[in-house]
Amino acid sequence: MLRAIIVDDEPKAIQSLSWELSNFDKDIEIINTFTEADKAIKHINESSIDCLFLDIEMPTMDGFQLLEKLNKRDFAVVITTAYNEYAIKALKNEAIDYLLKPIDTDDLEATINRIKNHNSKNNSS
């Protein structure tokens, strides 16, 4: 079971991604969602998760700032954004992938496979 957290300032984006993930793969559990990055930090630091789906453009703190404030990064990070120009920066910040909104089902499938590969490599180390 993959345990994930979604952080996005748009509730509809959270709802849509949660729905797509649960319909795509029954082995994915969304353990929490947050619309404010600063409120997500403590929970992410205290949780045992496999993946963080993270929006970049948020009002009080952007996704890159959130990543800098995390105590640990032993999980896969997937950037979700409507802006193509964040893709390279996301990968430079050690995200394993990015998804452009609106999220394409084929892209989501490829991302889920990357998460599973990432986690199996980390678990075997």
Predicted features, each with a name:
Residues 11-13, 37, 56-60:
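Short hydrophobic/aromatic-rich motifs at helix boundaries and adjacent loops
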